Amino acid sequence: MKKRWLAVVLAGALAGASLAGCSGPGPQGPIISPEDPIEEEVTINFWGWGDLAEQQNYQTLVNQFMAEEGNENITVIYRGINSATYMTTLRASSRNLPELFYMPDYDFLEWVSAGSLKDISAYVEEEELSQLWPQAVDEYYYNPDTATLGQSEGAGLYGLPKDLGPFTLVYNKSLLDARIEQKGLNADEIYAEYLTPTKAMTWEKFRTLLKMLVNDANNDGTPDDSVYGISHYEIETAVYSNNANFFNDDASEQRITDQNFIDALQFIADLTLVDHVMVPSALQSDMDGFTRFVNQQCIFSFMGPWDCAQFWGFDIPFTYNILPVPYNGENPDAMSTAWVGSMGYCVSARANSLQTAAAMRLAKYLCMNEEAQREFYELGQQVPNLVSMATDEYLNDTQGLLEGKDPADRSVWVDTINGTSDTDRIGGKVRPRYYTYSSGWYDDFLTYIDEQGLWTGERTAEQICKAYAPSFQSVLTEMKANLG
């Protein structure tokens, strides 16, 4: 899963060139079931991304797959690529794709609509899919006739979910406890009021807590000990947790001028401009949120399940835990809503019958094999894709594989994936870029609000959003046109 610890003020690279015509279907041949014996030798290339810990985890699982009985004739060449360059590398190879590769959810629509991905519906049984998180499976359905995402009549399945990754609030418990003691606060009261894994804080409570914890005696906006309350704030999380969005349901009309959206952006800016508890924009480029958190220069940040692999590998000298993301308590329709990222295991449309069978055997092993899923969560890679495993074995550590490992409240990740209900106000939502033809618009938006001075107080969120709305609407209209 791609790391998203970058500061909210930073802009990413623009989307790459169109994929149309780059890698359409090649000679297909008959369908070979992944369960049938593979008696011919076949080599498949499998590309993934991630930090070194994630790459090592995947090499371990690939080696185990090849060693299993029945896979003797399958050779998997695994290539782990840094997340910052993965999509650039994949685009450069679009005419000669690996047989199996990661596809981030926010690039899925562009690639599937270009014909680069194989429809794998015939290679998976409904009974197999029913074991997985429904929303994870739904993300990789696409109907080429109507150019629509999700399960529908005529839609095909173009990927198996690698994972669902809720990006939730994380705090340095050791640092927080020391700060509570230093300030003479009542620890039991603080935890009961603010730090409950089953009840999210409101924005107002979160701001209050951060101001209590930050040392800024002269109120000059700079902590006396260089320890900020929070490293940065995830824009999508703030927007979702105020019942807002970037556009309407079919991504055809902008919604950045809605008051809920504007209030969400201003909430983030005010953490620095008014409360002085978040790292200011001038310092955001000096150090990313992940590094700042690991270096204990902030109490709160954000993390996903995949970050455990790095934390455990670093053997960090503090205890950490996670919480549901805060929401706007003044909005009766708002709920704690983290963004939930995902990757798909996708097969190249040009893979032949034997390659496809081998690639699907590996994809199914990584996605839904019980032993593989157990190994993944033990390695700190993900919440299990298997719902029964996630909601019992993983949640309660019935196998004893997570004893002594943070976070203690990993139930927050499961709760976020599980979604909301009348009684459950904690949930998650796929990132908005998933719904659009390309994802570059998001980085363009971040660049614009940065250049316009939202984070430095030169302009308000309302001024910036209203000024940018016509340009954003043009981009949405163009992307819809690209889908036909």
Q: What feature does the model see in each segment?
A:
Residues 4-11, 19-116, 128-131, 180-189, ...:
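Conserved N-terminal structural module of periplasmic/extracytoplasmic solute-binding proteins
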Residues 51, 103-107, 232-235, 286, ...:
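Beta->alpha turn/N-cap motifs
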Residues 72-75, 151-155, 274, 314-388:
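Extracytoplasmic/periplasmic substrate-recognition and gating elements
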Residues 83-93, 222-227, 232, 241-319, ...:
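Extracytoplasmic ligand-binding clamshell segments of periplasmic binding protein
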Residues 86-97, 114, 175-176, 205-213, ...:
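Short helices/loops that flank or line small-molecule/ion binding pockets
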Residues 105-168, 204, 321-326, 405-408:
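Hinge/lid segment of periplasmic solute-binding proteins
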Residues 123-127, 144-234, 246-282, 349-357, ...:
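Helix-loop-helix "hinge/cap" segment bordering the ligand-binding cleft or interdomain interface
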Residues 323-325, 377-454, 458, 478-484:
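Long, aromatic- and glycine/proline-rich binding clefts that accommodate carbohydrate-like moieties
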